[in-house]
C-alpha cells in the first residue's frame, strides 16, 4: 500500500519578502541618517574649533601689540606747525577708523616680531597696522591682515602682509577717551595728529571681531570682543582751539 507523505516545509510568500525588504530599507535608512548626522556634527565642531582658535590668536596678537603701544609726549611730541617741513606726519601717531563693517588701525608698538636679517638687533619699535582685504585666492572671502614695519614713515598696506584670520564678516573698533571717569566718550575714528582731536590719544580701545563658518557664511558668526586700557596716553591740549 502506498503512503502519502505530507511535506510541511513552506517557502516565503511574496508579501513576506516585500515586508522584509521594506523593514531592511527602514533600518538602513535610519543607520545611514544617523551616520551622516554624526559626520556633519563632527565636521561642524571641527570647523567651529578652528574658527575659534583663529579668532583667539588674532585677538591675543592685538592685545600684545596694544599693551606695548608707544605714545610720545612733549617735548618729544611736536605739533604739526612746529615740525620740520620733511616731517609732516608724526611717525608715532595713532590712527583708527571704524565707520563701516571693517575698521583700520595704525599705531607704533614695542611688540615688533623680529626677523633675522630684516630687524635690528634687540628688536625695536615698529608701526603696526590692522586692516581687512579680499583674499587673493577668493574675492568672496575677507581676511584680516597685520603689517609690522620698522620703517615708521613708509605706508603699511602692501596687501602682502601676513593673514591673521580668514572669513571675517566684521571688524569694529570703539575709541574711548576720558579725563574723568564720569565723562567717558566713545568715537568711531581717531587721529592723534588731528587738531580736531587736540592731538590726544585714546585712553582705551574696544575691539569686536566677527568670523563666519566658511560652509555657512550667512548664519550667525562667531563674535570675539575685548578691550584694552592703554598704559600710556596723551591728554587733549587745552591750548588748542
Question: Whereabouts are the PLM-identified features?
Answer:
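N-terminal leader/signal peptides at the extreme start of proteins
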Residues: 1-12
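Residue-level detector of short, conserved catalytic/binding motifs and their immediate flanks
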Residues: 12, 128, 205
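Alpha-helical hydrophobic helix detector
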Residues: 17-33
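Extracytoplasmic beta-strand-rich oligomerization domains located immediately C-terminal to a leader/signal peptide
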Residues: 34-156
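Short, mixed charged/polar active-site loops
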Residues: 121-127, 156-162, 219-225
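Short, solvent-exposed loop/turn segments that connect beta-strands within catalytic domains
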Residues: 135-141, 153-157, 180-184, 215-220
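Short linear sequence signals and composition-biased patches located at protein termini or domain-edge surfaces
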Residues: 162-165, 169-241
Amino acid at each position: 500500500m502506498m503512503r502519502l507523505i505530507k511535506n510541511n516545509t513552506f517557502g516565503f510568500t511574496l508579501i513576506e519578502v516585500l515586508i522584509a525588504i521594506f523593514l531592511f530599507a527602514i533600518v538602513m535608512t535610519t543607520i545611514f541618517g544617523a551616520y551622516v548626522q554624526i559626520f556633519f556634527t563632527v565636521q561642524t565642531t571641527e570647523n567651529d574649533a578652528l574658527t575659534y582658535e583663529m579668532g583667539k590668536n588674532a585677538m591675543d596678537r592685538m592685545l600684545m601689540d596694544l599693551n606695548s603701544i608707544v605714545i610720545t609726549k612733549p617735548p618729544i611730541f611736536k605739533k604739526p606747525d612746529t615740525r620740520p617741513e620733511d616731517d609732516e606726519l608724526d611717525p608715532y601717531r595713532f590712527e583708527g577708523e571704524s565707520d563701516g563693517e571693517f575698521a583700520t588701525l595704525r599705531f607704533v608698538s614695542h611688540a615688533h616680531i623680529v626677523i633675522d636679517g630684516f630687524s635690528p638687533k634687540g628688536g625695536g619699535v615698529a608701526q603696526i597696522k590692522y586692516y581687512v582685504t579680499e583674499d587673493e585666492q577668493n574675492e568672496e572671502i575677507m581676511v584680516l591682515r597685520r603689517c609690522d614695519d620698522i620703517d615708521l614713515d613708509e605706508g603699511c598696506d602692501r596687501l602682502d602682509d601676513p593673514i591673521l584670520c580668514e572669513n571675517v564678516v566684521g571688524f569694529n573698533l570703539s575709541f574711548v577717551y576720558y579725563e574723568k571717569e564720569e565723562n567717558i566718550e566713545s568715537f568711531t575714528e581717531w587721529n592723534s595728529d588731528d587738531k580736531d582731536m587736540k592731538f590726544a590719544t585714546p585712553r582705551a580701545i574696544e575691539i569686536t571681531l566677527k568670523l563666519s563658518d566658511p560652509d555657512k557664511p550667512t548664519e550667525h558668526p562667531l563674535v570675539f570682543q575685548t578691550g584694552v586700557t592703554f598704559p600710556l596716553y596723551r591728554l587733549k591740549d587745552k591750548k588748542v582751539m
